[in-house]
């Protein structure tokens, strides 16, 4: 049986994205980060809404239209409407951060 916490490489030069399921407009991804962040001045501007939860580790998101960043720890989730510009400011370097992202 597949497991979200299996097959996580010890070293990750960049984020690891794995599509777990895709049907019509819905896509479910596992994202693994380990001390990663978005490049300077880069903003995600996605055509699809995204719902994301942190399953392991911790992260900080920044939304272009918000004055303060959003810190996420295990169990925290956020809905990101389509075209709401955001970036990953930080993921913990202490352990892999495992996200589950659902694009709607």
Predicted regions and their residues:
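A short beta-strand-loop-beta hairpin characteristic of the jelly-roll/cupin
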Residues: 39, 44-46, 51-74
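Short strand-connecting beta-turns/loops that link adjacent beta-strands
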Residues: 25, 66, 93-95
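Residue-level recognition of conserved beta-strand positions in structured domain cores
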Residues: 30, 56, 63-65, 82, ...
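A short, N-terminal "cap"/entry segment at the start of jelly-roll beta-barrel domains
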Residues: 1-43
